[in-house]
Amino acid sequence: LIDEYRRFADVILVSSASGLRWHPRTLHRLRQRCAAIVIRRNQGYDFGSWKAALHLHQHDIDQAAFLVLTNDSFWGPITPLDDLFQRLHASAADVIGLTDDLMYAPHLSSAFVAYKAKALQCQAFGHFWKTLENWPRKRDLVKQCEVGLPVQLRAAGLKLESLYTHNANGNVLHYDWKKLIEQHGFPFLKVSLLRDNPTRQPVETWPQVIGQRNPQLAASIQHQLMPKPGFQRLIQRLRRGLNRSDGKGSRAVIAPKSRR
């Protein structure tokens, strides 16, 4: 995905994986692809990481005509991103997201949002990042940041646009994932949809949907979804221990559950 992004922009990678410093091969590969790498403690979720990058590279961003803030919640690209970036540049809006959501207040989903020069130079944009707090609870972060920032930018007179959805309600990337890909050319698949699927959406056809468009990506997702060998051995030991019964008590079964 980084290789695809760098076709259209300089990539600044922010990572909370402190152990990355001790993996020289991985770091070398990333340095070949990224304009800068920031390694920091995991504070403030995505917005804390973006704030750190914006602060460290303020000079470059002040001169930028275009900025995209995105996270690692996507698998992709399902198809090349040429069409997406053409639409981003062609949009008359100042702030462009991929999807929107009506929860709490109409806003753009924060997983991928592009800001044009007018937004970057807007006083409300700078004030938001300067005064941003590290919210310990994700629910508070969603209200104050994912919802709060678009609301403040709209109030400041900026124009906002969602490219793939209009007035969506809830996590459209879960309940409408297939339609978005097949009918609208959405180039990503949400990681949490396959790893966790909290609302039990029908996802059985994802290998075909993705495989028809990007077989290499489908194979990579399959590999990442496989439980690690050490985890499998742990689960097997737990099953053997908990499934033993002397006929006097209840029986418990633990099944593996992937965690993001």
Predicted features and spans:
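ER/Golgi luminal nucleotide-sugar-dependent glycosyltransferases, focusing on the catalytic module
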Residues: 1-260
